[in-house]
Amino acid sequence: MAPNPRKSHPLLKMINNSLIDLPTPPNISAWWNFGSLLALCLVTQILTGLLLAMHYTADTTLAFSSVAHTCRNVQYGWLIRNMHANGASFFFICIYMHIGRGFYYGSYLHKETWNTGVLLLLTLMATAFVGYVLPWGQMSFWGATVITNMFSAIPYIGQTIVEWAWGGFSVDNPTLTRFFALHFLLPFMIAGLTLIHLTFLHESGSNNPLGIVSNCDKIPFHPYYSLKDILGLALLLLPLTAMALFSPNLLGDPENFTPANPLVTPPHIKPEWYFLFAYAILRSIPNKLGGVLALAASVLVLLLCPFLHTSKQRTMAFRPLSQSLFWILVANLLILTWIGSQPVEHPFIIIGQLASTTYFIILLILFPITSALENKMLNF
């Protein structure tokens, strides 16, 4: 019989083993769709970003007007920009759902896959942050100033690091130039990390909603899940396109329609909605260094998940107490997101402090205790 190039060709063989003949659990739900949706988001962002970069000028005097020029004079420039800006929001919606699914179903017990995933999240956050600075509006400028200035909280070397990052004594032209370079580079780093993430995932195989080994009962990825993923892609592209066409500025900040002015501070500096939960945690601590450490901990706490797993069962599918705690955590994150968008005044300060404390207590204390309690209940 003639050899099948799909299975023998060095390149096609890799694609075949990852996307066609990949053995997949037969019972994975729609929550497992978000991996491929994230890949779609990345491709969309790189393509639209490449087209935008062709018309963008990384100079403080021209950046704002070059973005305006793209929207006004470039063929479909407005659409490309709207897809790129809102694509970032959908990217974060997908990654938060993906992390939530991993947390709920115990996927973090694949330690290498989970750790590369956390690294991907951090890289994505860095990419989104430097990208937000590029239009050089008021919120871009002041957001860059506030967030980069946090590094000055590091003892001894903090101020030096900040000035080194700025390329001067304030956020100015060198800062914008290097942020553009970083924003161009990081998505390709994300693409590389994604391949490492997938390599680790395919080493162990996918988890499933029951959390049990399904090696004896797997089905090929194509045509079953390839078709299911295409439905997911359509359901993602539909709201993204609708948003880009009908309400492109819904999630943006009106301040960013004003060109950057170092002499006028906006009344309320805040990042994009997807960083608000971390921003609320940062603001809830009155001490600068303490706030920065809490901000870092709010994301890095994910690295501890595999070590805090005390349950005999992998997923939360049959653990009602942990389920309740999980949804309380989700509600808590939504409260933090809301608090991050509010001004620093009573009652928002105390609500933010309570929500921040609750966030860490649930993750670090209540989940391990509840899991241990559920183990005890299994004996009765």
Swiss-Prot record:
Membrane topology: Multi-pass membrane protein
Textual note on the cofactor: Binds 2 heme b groups non-covalently.
PROSITE patterns: CYTB_CTER (PS51003), CYTB_NTER (PS51002)
One GO biological process term: mitochondrial electron transport, ubiquinol to cytochrome c
Binding-site list for a ubiquinone: H202
GO cellular component term of the entry, any: respiratory chain complex III
Co-factor requirement: heme b
Source species, domain of life: Eukaryota
Keywords: Electron transport, Heme, Iron, Membrane, Metal-binding, Mitochondrion, Mitochondrion inner membrane, Respiratory chain, Transmembrane, Transmembrane helix, Transport, Ubiquinone
Positions annotated to bind heme b b562: H84, H183
GO molecular function, one term: ubiquinol-cytochrome-c reductase activity
Main location: mitochondrion
Function field: Component of the ubiquinol-cytochrome c reductase complex (complex III or cytochrome b-c1 complex) that is part of the mitochondrial respiratory chain. The b-c1 complex mediates electron transfer from ubiquinol to cytochrome c. Contributes to the generation of a proton gradient across the mitochondrial membrane that is then used for ATP synthesis.
Miscellaneous remark of the record: Heme 1 (or BL or b562) is low-potential and absorbs at about 562 nm, and heme 2 (or BH or b566) is high-potential and absorbs at about 566 nm.
Assembly: The cytochrome bc1 complex contains 11 subunits: 3 respiratory subunits (MT-CYB, CYC1 and UQCRFS1), 2 core proteins (UQCRC1 and UQCRC2) and 6 low-molecular weight proteins (UQCRH/QCR6, UQCRB/QCR7, UQCRQ/QCR8, UQCR10/QCR9, UQCR11/QCR10 and a cleavage product of UQCRFS1). This cytochrome bc1 complex then forms a dimer.
Protein name, entry field: Cytochrome b
